[in-house]
């Protein structure tokens, strides 16, 4: 696994067979070491913003990924799995509706830098596949929720935290969601799967209004806090049928409730009410 200097890896200590290489997308030597003797490359890396300049974000992510794919080609890697994003989409065709949800064949017209970078990398991935360097599979998740090594960085943590201490919250907007379990399962389902070569899969479980989510949190943890705000838009209907057909399971809002319970439990075990030095 390629990790940055200072990456949190304590939660991975139980996995004894992981070899760590400290490096980055800018470091070609570390990229070459990463893919040496590897059969499959899972590309999750993204040089983060927003503190970096646009030029730096483009150079590191796009040029760095091209270097990574080139090193994979030299090392004769058999398969590359690239974690893209549904933010490659921007403008929606007028034909998209609940009966005809957006699928993997919908044209991409990203509206922001992150989506544009992911879209550019997808293009390079297909170029390498076309040249028969290796098989490529692209996964496009929406907002991923799951417990992070730094618990306060977990999705919806702040809302759960405020309601756990009986504060009122003001919520607006909405989000598409998928659990980290489904994302991992997506990787497992395409790993070594010849039928997935050259394919794109949407990883999306559902869509929820943040106000609805807040009320779900309050009910789940028996909070006295109140949720106020406005409902978000209904969102663009998206299809996850292709992912389901290869075996990915999406468990809906029941999975969110289990996640809320887990975050609430971990808050108590690792610091409780706002003792963040222990998170």
Which sequence ranges carry the predicted segments?
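NAD(P)-dependent short-chain dehydrogenase/reductase
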Residues: 127-175
């Amino acid at each position: 696994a390629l990790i940055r200097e200072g990456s949190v890896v304590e939660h991975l200590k139980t996995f004894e067979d992981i070899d760590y290489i400290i490096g980055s997308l800018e470091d070609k030597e570390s990229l070459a070491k990463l893919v040496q003797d590897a059969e499959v490359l899972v590309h999750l890396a993204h040089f983060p913003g927003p503190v970096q300049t646009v030029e730096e974000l483009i150079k590191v992510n796009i040029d760095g990924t091209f270097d990574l794919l080139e090193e994979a080609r030299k090392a004769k890697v058999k398969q590359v799995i690239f974690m893209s994003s549904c933010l490659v989409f921007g403008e929606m065709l007028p034909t998209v509706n609940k009966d005809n949800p957006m699928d993997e064949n919908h044209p991409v017209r990203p509206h922001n830098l992150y989506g544009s970078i992911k879209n550019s990398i997808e293009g390079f991935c297909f170029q390498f596949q076309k040249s028969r360097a290796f098989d490529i599979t692209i996964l496009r998740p929406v907002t991923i929720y799951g417990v992070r090594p730094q618990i306060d960085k977990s999705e919806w943590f702040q809302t759960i935290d405020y309601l756990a201490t009986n504060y009122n919250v003001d919520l607006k907007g909405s989000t598409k969601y998928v659990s980290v379990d489904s994302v991992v399962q997506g990787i497992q389902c395409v790993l070594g799967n010849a039928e997935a070569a050259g394919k794109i899969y949407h990883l999306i479980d559902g869509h929820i209004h943040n106000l609805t989510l807040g009320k779900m949190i309050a009910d789940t943890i028996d909070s006295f806090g109140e949720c106020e705000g406005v409902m978000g838009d209904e969102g663009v209907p998206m299809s996850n049928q292709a992912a389901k057909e290869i075996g990915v399971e999406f468990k809906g809002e029941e999975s969110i409730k289990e996640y809320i319970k887990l975050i609430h439990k971990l808050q108590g075990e690792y610091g409780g009410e706002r003792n963040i030095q222990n998170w």
